[in-house]
Amino acid sequence: MNKNIFCALVAAGVIVSAPVFANDDDVIDVQNTEVTVFGETRAFVEGGTATGKDPELKTSYSKLGVKYNNQFSPLTSVFGELSVDVDINGDGSDDITSRFGYVGVKSDLLGALSIGKTSSIMDSYVNKGAQFKASGNGSIQQTPFKLTNSVKYEKTTPIGVTFGAQSQMLDGATDETFDLWQIGATYQGVGVTYADDVINNISYYGIGASRSYGPISASGSFSVQDTTTTDIMGYEVVGGYTIKETTTILAGYGDTDATGDDGLITGGVHYKLGSDAVLFTEIDYDLDTEESVYSAGLGITF
């Protein structure tokens, strides 16, 4: 099935590649449907100071996909996405896996409703500490990034506030209609979300914020995982400074109140090569083990 999905994406890319890459907006009309091809290739070397940690070449976090939009009336359109994650690690196991696949209907008046495998609203509303390419972001307490068998609704008001609601509906033994649900809102870089994983008796809630002041950026999150036996609080903060619009220096810290977790310090430097490529070098320092993991590589997006 994964190979079939990949072949379909490759075929779509071949069909639209010439006009798409000739268009600055990367959009082409195919039988009155706007098709946008997007992706990212990220390759890096990862090593560390722990015993037995040898340098390793990785291509994780790469992706390829297409998005569709068809305006069938002046006020309403249908949209969708089909995408895969690609990890060309050479071991022949799970190199290509499904990322998202959904269809939906949207209008400026009523909002957007989609069904399928969608991205979690908690990740986009709260998880503001995900600023690094291959490091950090280990303290966030949230629902899974990818939600299969889900229904997702979002509506942006005239004043710019976006409200979101999402549920996961699985045919499981517990006979619950909504196996997981979450609601949230975001406005000008600040977001809040509450989620309830009914099947596993876990609730999540959190707040995240991201701000830029000229060359200075600041982002972070506070989140909680609440189970029947214990609560885990996590927080992350990341600061950045951009030099001449090409070089960004990042520093971050994340921690939870879980036993044995003293936190993680992360640093990195990102250097832009044009508008679509970034050279990066990053390092994680674990305050528990006093070991570090470093990475250096290149990411290209389109």
Language-model segments: residues:
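Outer-membrane beta-barrel proteins
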Residues: 2-302
